[in-house]
């Protein structure tokens, strides 16, 4: 179905795109293949709050930027003014995720990063009289992708913040919008222009050489009846526009980007409903038992995760998940992270085992300022040190 390509060369003229090990082997600059120990499965982390800041993740960093009390990037830029905001966000972009972070991820056996970005990274799409977002992020995205590519990490770029906001009152869209304004033709057009632009950057800039997947929108409204236009118009046009951009660059079909959508289980309908071509389509599911209709007990969480089949569109990557439990119990003695490490190790193992029945997993998130490893892969690492490939860790 998909032929295996020759080993990746970091010195190739145009960057390429693929699923690692399925379509192509990739290595770091020193020749290490991070996917060997995972049998090709994706084992990754999200870089939450790097380019789309979610204040709940890092309240101190948010306050230090001068954004304290603001709900979203839009609100902070409005408050600080463009020039001051650009300076504050540049400082954040240069310090939140560093090259040392990338090296640490590799040392823990991870092989993939998912990078949430907003459409405003293409700055000519922003209505400057009514939209307020930081400027200058592309340079920092380039640097990050170069570090990750040199380290041999696979990279997924995710349109986390869509024009008009794809869901209301949520800072992960970059704004705290009262309604989901994304589901209109002119907003779709803005997102499509972003996808074309990002596709061209990925293929023409060698710093993006390990970007193999582009997610066209993160977490749309979970009501299939309200987002029919996304399935009938936006998804098919995203495929057409991305492929047209690749064809204009004479990219070989085997080097196309995988185009990722939320899967049917997410609740926004079947993403394939109006697609006429699913070549190099990929799918994303987010699995937070914290908010699921599951009995709140340790046995229930373990058994649910052990039996989780996630039968849906394929190939599916579980692109977000965590170890957090419901707010009303999360700091009780029965659930506190400090006194229940053995349970959380077992639950971690149960989840990754289930998700590797699919294409793999990406934990939310790499780092946070919560003092809680249930949301921060870096923050405890009692779970994975010295590496996720350690069979002792993965045994229930």
Swiss-Prot record:
It catalyses: Random hydrolysis of (1->6)-linkages in (1->6)-beta-D-glucans. Keywords: Carbohydrate metabolism, Cell wall biogenesis/degradation, Glycoprotein, Glycosidase, Hydrolase, Polysaccharide degradation, Secreted, Signal. Residues 1-17 form the signal peptide. The keyword NAD does not apply. This is Probable glucan endo-1,6-beta-glucosidase B. Pfam families: Cellulase (PF00150). Glycans are attached at residues 30, 272. Belongs to the glycosyl hydrolase 5 (cellulase A) family. One of its GO terms (biological process) is glucan catabolic process. GO terms for molecular function: glucan endo-1,6-beta-glucosidase activity; glucan exo-1,3-beta-glucosidase activity. InterPro entries: Glyco_hydro_5 (IPR001547), Glycoside_hydrolase_SF (IPR017853), Glycosyl_hydrolase_5 (IPR050386). It is found in: Secreted. The gene is exgB. GO terms for cellular component: extracellular region. Beta-glucanases participate in the metabolism of beta-glucan, the main structural component of the cell wall. Acts on lutean, pustulan and 1,6-oligo-beta-D-glucosides. Gene3D superfamilies: Glycosidases (3.20.20.80). The active site is at residues 219, 320. Its EC number is 3.2.1.75. Its main location: secreted.
